[in-house]
Structure formats: C-alpha cells, structure tokens
C-alpha cells in the first residue's frame, strides 16, 4: 500500500427495473442499500489507496435503456455500448456498475472487462443483487471493479489472514474480505502499463 499512489474512482451505479420491482418500487430502500454497498466497497479499496465514491445512482423505474438478459456477456456488452453512447454524454464518470435482479445463466453473480478502467466502452461491470446481505453484494461489485483495475482471479482457497480474498472465483460467504498481495500486484501492473488518467482527479 505504501507504494500505491492515491487514486479516485467516481462510480455510477444503475439499478434496473427488476431491482426497482424487487423492492416494491421503494426508491429509498434501493438508495440506502446502494449507498451502504458502496461504503463497504470503499473500505475494501482503502488498502489500495483508492477512494471509491458514488457520484450518481440511476434507478430505472420504467423500461431499461439497455438489453438485460440471462446471458451475462450480452448484458455486459449492452451496458458498455450504453455507457459510451448515452451515459458519457450526460456524466463524465470513471466507471459504471449495473445492479440487476435477473437470473444469469450458469449461476453467474457478476461479470466485468479486464484492464478497462477509464475506457469509454468497457469501464463497466454487472452485478446480480444475489443476497439480502449488503456485504456479499459489495464483495461481488468490488470483485468486478477489481477486474476493471487489472486483477485476475486468486486461487479458490485464497485467504489473507482470517479474511477471504475478494478476487476468489465465485463467492464464498464469510464475514471479512480483503484484497490479496497478488491483487495488489495486478493493480500495480495495470497502473504502470495502462496509466489510467480518469482516476487521477478528486471527485
């Protein structure tokens, strides 16, 4: 951490119509949940000297403006096109994460592009609202953001002290999670190789 420079991620979270309906159209419940999730994510990223702040939350109460389907790859592709063509024209932010209540094939909980932070089309991830426990959804979103920041998967049994590693494949329910040394190394390599500019400025 000592060697990692201070960086700032301005995050947009979009909650789809399925999430809106799942919480009985209660915007306050969704807002509170997303704010708590991003707070937890920010806590995880402190060890990497990254501030993650929620700069915009969109809740789609009407028709979803992008194609959300059981194929996570197609949904991720659709979100990327939407970010590039629509979102960036309205809000110049660093990354967008889609929170959806759809059932993806193969029990997928999330998906994201690797090494893509700051890229207009591919600085995106999708996360299934798969648990009532905020911590577990936060781990999934932190994991997808990790891919955007260059992190590959850890081993399936990876631990850091008593904590489970955030970049394990799949999700093991637990009480505490941290980034592994390998994850920090991948992130350092991403910074050196891609030199992402959008995360330099304070929100």
From Swiss-Prot:
Q: What is its main location?
A: secreted
User: What biological-process terms (Gene Ontology) are attached?
Assistant: proteolysis
Listed EC numbers: 3.4.24.46
In alphabetical order, the GO MF annotations are:
metal ion binding; metalloendopeptidase activity
Identify the Pfam families for this entry: Reprolysin
Note accompanying the cofactor annotation: Binds 1 zinc ion per subunit.
Q: Keywords in UniProt for this one?
A: Calcium, Disulfide bond, Hydrolase, Metal-binding, Metalloprotease, Protease, Secreted, Zinc
Is NADP tagged as a keyword? no
So where does Ca(2+) get bound?
A: 10, 94, 198, 201
The family annotation for this protein states: Belongs to the venom metalloproteinase (M12B) family. P-I subfamily.
Protein name as annotated: Snake venom metalloproteinase adamalysin-2
Q: What is the lineage of its organism?
A: Eukaryota, Metazoa, Chordata, Craniata, Vertebrata
